[in-house]
A protein has these predicted regions:
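Serine residues within intrinsically disordered or low-complexity segments
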Residues: 3, 8, 13, 17, ...
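N-terminal leader/targeting signatures
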Residues: 1, 9, 13, 30, ...
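Intrinsic-disorder-associated, low-complexity terminal segments enriched in Asp/Asn/His/Tyr and depleted
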Residues: 2, 11-12, 21, 36, ...
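Short, positively charged and aromatic/hydrophobic N-terminal segments
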Residues: 58, 65-72, 78-90
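Ligand-binding pockets and gating/stacking loops
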Residues: 72, 85-575
Length: 575
């Protein structure tokens, strides 16, 4: 057996309490174990909740100061002058407000602020443009490195069933394999699910990694899966203790999107990382792993909200000035805030707000630049092309992602938008978490909603000459339990699949990836990797490799270097 991980020594971590997850540090019988990143094979120390980021550039603006300034300006000068997206930390394309309470600057813990989405102009502005890059790294000399100028990560929220989509096992016992049949694809020797007919014709562009798993380091629940797959860092002991009650911490490791935002030169007008069509989770149930965390909120992605009811509405009025606000009046407000900033700097005897002023300038540029607003305007696309993508929220999110790639945005994340109707039908929370009615929900809803938009995205990028410089990643926080029958939804009769973090699949295309190949295999029932097992850290390193980011050094407050990701290696065989 060819393993990417040497067997680890037994550690002292408590066994997990969730399904689909061997105890941390131990492989299932006969399975390769993942290596712990901490010395001696022990799990990393628990992350400690704190009230501010541990790591940042020494010149990073202090959030508390900037929050005070802008909340003060909103209360005392002209509340209407600050557009909603500046005030609330995310663009809400549905027109719903996310009120900014003045108690924020009086001492609400930053963890609560993160859960609420950063209710301040700082979160709305500083999260827009990834700040000043610490220096884009030169393209590595390894094969395929640096080809990708942009990346689109499509995240199938809830835990997509690998055994029903990318890794079917027609020879497995009936209680494992389910009713779906594999079909031939445009890549010889590769089969996909029969309910992905359009994507099957794009298989010559796909690399399918079938041997991805958490190696016993996760918890079997969503929050840990999000964190591991979005950051490349294994969940610490706080995830094992709190499970899905583990909310984002300021000293978490940053998302892949935020690392790209840090390492790539800032876009002159647009954010360096954008997330569509939502931030994952409710304020009290926010998924960890989406944020810049210890890098500082200036490297957060911009979260752009969309809706199933109005899938084209990634456009004004949310990106426009309010009707009663002219450009001139906005300029006056901007100058007023500049005076407040200058007074604060003089009072402190420092220039710690210098970077924030640059974020403000870019925010003003986005509001007043027609080119910036144009990138979000899907009405500029022809109706036939919109129909090719599918006119639902997934199709329009992927079409917008392509437009943002054309506009030069380095990293776009597209989460699956929850469908309330699916929640009752599949016991899934509205997504891919198919605890019940797994096969009907996949066949009638989830797979068709992915098949058309994803296949069209790959075609569209290729037709425009963009696929070779755009990496497309399709992933999820976990797979589904291969043995059918979820005890929470009627057992075998419920036809659901429970959580399964020991094995899942990820699709890669573009950005130098050689299509028409499969990396790794699973056992006869798709329960565990059988050959070349890898973890999310390897996928993260592969993304960085494709984007030419070979220097993963960042700096703490004392300007001391630290590595953003030490574990894992890029899967260079895929290039």
């Amino acid at each position: 057996m060819n393993s990417a991980f040497p067997a680890s020594a037994a550690d002292n971590s408590p066994p997990a309490s969730r399904v689909g997850h061997p105890a941390p540090g131990h492989a299932a019988p006969g399975r390769p174990a993942f290596r712990h990143s901490a010395p001696g094979g022990h799990a990393p120390a628990p992350a400690r909740p704190v009230t501010g980021p541990l790591f940042s550039r020494s010149t990073r603006p202090r959030p508390a100061d900037t929050i005070r300034q802008l909340c003060f300006a909103r209360r005392h000068f002209d509340k209407a002058a600050i557009p909603g997206w500046m005030a609330h930390g995310s663009i809400d394309m549905t027109g719903q407000s996310r009120g900014c309470g003045s108690p924020l600057h009086g001492g609400i813990p930053r963890r609560t602020w993160l859960q609420a989405g950063g209710c301040s102009a700082l979160a709305g502005l500083a999260g827009l443009w990834g700040g000043l890059a610490q220096g884009a790294t030169p393209a590595a000399s390894k094969a395929g490195a640096g080809r990708a100028k942009s990346a689109i990560m499509i995240f199938l929220s809830g835990g997509a069933s690998h055994i029903d989509t990318w890794d079917l096992k027609p020879q497995a016992p009936l209680e494992y394999r389910g009713p779906f049949q594999p079909i031939h694809t445009s890549a010889p020797g590769i089969e996909l699910c029969e309910h992905l007919p359009l994507l099957s014709q794009q298989a010559h562009r796909l690399a399918i990694v079938r041997s991805l798993g958490d190696g016993g380091r996760g918890t079997g629940d969503h929050h840990a899966g999000y964190y591991y797959n979005l950051t490349g860092h294994a969940p610490d002991q706080t995830f094992h203790r709190l499970l899905n009650a583990r909310t984002p911490y300021p000293d978490d490791w940053p998302s892949i999107a935020s690392v790209v935002s840090l390492k790539r030169p800032p876009h002159p007008q647009l954010p360096s990382a954008i997330t569509l069509p939502q931030k994952e989770g409710a304020p009290e149930y926010t998924r960890p792993g989406q944020f810049a965390a210890r890098l500082g909120i200036e490297f957060d992605p911009l979260f752009v909200d969309g809706s199933r009811e109005k899938p084209l509405a990634f456009a004004p009025p949310a990106l426009a000035l309010q009707s009663e606000i002219s450009v001139g009046r906005m300029q006056n407000r901007r100058e007023l805030l500049a005076l407040v900033d200058a007074a604060q700097r003089r009072a402190e005897g420092s220039d710690s707000l210098g970077n924030y002023g640059k974020h403000q300038s870019k925010a003003f540029s986005l509001l007043t630049s027609q080119a910036s607003k144009s990138a979000f305007d899907l009405q500029q696309e022809s109706e036939p092309l919109r129909e090719r993508y599918g006119t639902g929220i997934m199709g329009m999110s992927l079409l917008l992602a392509r437009r943002l790639v054309e506009a030069g945005v380095p990293f776009i994340t597209v989460f699956y938008k929850a469908n309330k109707e699916l929640d009752s039908l599949c016991k899934s929370g509205g997504g891919w978490d198919t605890h019940g009615n797994n096969f009907n929900c996949l066949k009638d809803r989830l797979l068709p909603e992915l098949d058309r938009p994803l296949s069209t995205l790959l075609e569209d990028l290729a037709e425009r000459g963009l696929l070779d410089e755009t990496m497309v990643i399709v992933t999820s926080e976990m797979g589904r339990k291969p043995k059918i029958g979820d005890p929470r939804s009627g057992g075998v009769n419920g036809a659901g699949r429970d959580h399964w973090t020991a094995c899942q699949s990820v699709l890669l295309a573009g950005g130098g990836i050689r299509g028409g190949q499969v990396y790794g295999t699973t056992d006869r029932n798709a329960e565990y990797p059988a050959d070349r097992p890898v973890g999310p850290e390897h996928i993260a390193q592969t993304i960085y490799h494709a984007m030419g980011i070979d220097d993963l050094t960042a700096y703490d407050r004392q300007n001391r270097p630290f590595s953003l990701l030490e574990s894992g290696q890029p899967l260079t065989e895929l290039f």
